[in-house]
Amino acid sequence: MADVVNYKSQNRNLVRKFKCNAFSNPISEQKYIWLYIKALRYVEYYQNTSSGTINKLLMLWWLRKLRKYSHITSFQIPPNVCGKGLTIWHWGSIIINPHAKIGDNCTLYPGVLIGHKKPDGGAATIGDNVFIGAGTKVIGPVKIGNNVTIGQNCVITKDIPDNSVVVCNNENRILR
C-alpha cells in the first residue's frame, strides 16, 4: 500500500503515462503485473492494520483479487515478504516461501524460486537492491547481501556477500 501511495504522489505524470500505455492494450502483461503488486500491497496493509470488521472485509476482497491475478500471472508471493519497490518485469512462475525475507528494491524475473530444502528448514534472507535473473533458484537459509546481481539460471545454496555479481555456468562464481 505504501509503495502505491508514495509512487503515485512522487510520480504523477509518470503514472498517467504508464496507465495510458499499459491499459490501452487490454492484454498488456504490465497491466496485470501492476494490478498483482497493487493487490498484494493492499492485502499487506489490511493484514497489518487494526482488526475492524470493515478492514477484514476489505482484506478478503483484496485477497480475492490477489488470487485472481495470481492465476493470471503465475506469481505466488505471500504478503509481508517483500520490501518496498518490488519490480517484476514479465509474467511467469515466481514462487516465494512465506518465511523468506526480501529487502527493498528487489527485481525478479520469471522462473525465480525462493524456497527451503526441508519442510522445517529456513528460507532465504535477501538484502536491498538485489537483481535476481530468470530461472534462478535460491534454496535454503542463505543470506544474500545488499546490491547483489544474480544472473539467470543460477542455483544459490550458499551465502553471497554485499556488492557481488553471481554468474553460473557449471558452478556458481562470485565475480566481485
Predicted regions: what they are:
Residues 1-73:
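Terminal amphipathic alpha-helical/low-complexity segments used for targeting or macromolecular assembly
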Residues 79, 84-85, 89-92, 97-98, ...:
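Left-handed beta-helix
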Residues 74-78:
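Conserved NTPase motor "head" modules and their coupling/switch loops across ABC/AAA+ ATPases, GTPases
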